[in-house]
Amino acid sequence: MKASELKAKTVDELKAELLSLLKAQFALRMQHATQQLAKTSELKKVRRDIARVRTVLKEKAV
């Protein structure tokens, strides 16, 4: 997900996106812990998407 796409969204949409990403991260961590996760790079992608969403939320708050 690109930062420009995130900046076009409203605060409520960003919060919903953040919640879904956090749920996805939890599911991926559980799969990784039980050795069911084939693509471990997905964890990195989700973690960085979460950081992007949080950054845009902070920018909009200022």
Swiss-Prot record:
Q: Where are the transmembrane segments?
A: none
Q: Name one GO molecular function term.
A: structural constituent of ribosome
What InterPro entries does UniProt report for this protein, alphabetically?
Answer: Ribosomal_protein_uL29, Ribosomal_uL29, Ribosomal_uL29_CS, Ribosomal_uL29_sf
Pfam families reported for this sequence: Ribosomal_L29
Alphabetical GO CC annotations of the entry are: cytosolic large ribosomal subunit
Extract the NCBIfam families matched here.
Answer: L29
The entry assigns this protein to a family as follows: Belongs to the universal ribosomal protein uL29 family.
Name of the molecule in the record:
Large ribosomal subunit protein uL29
Q: Which gene encodes it?
A: rpmC
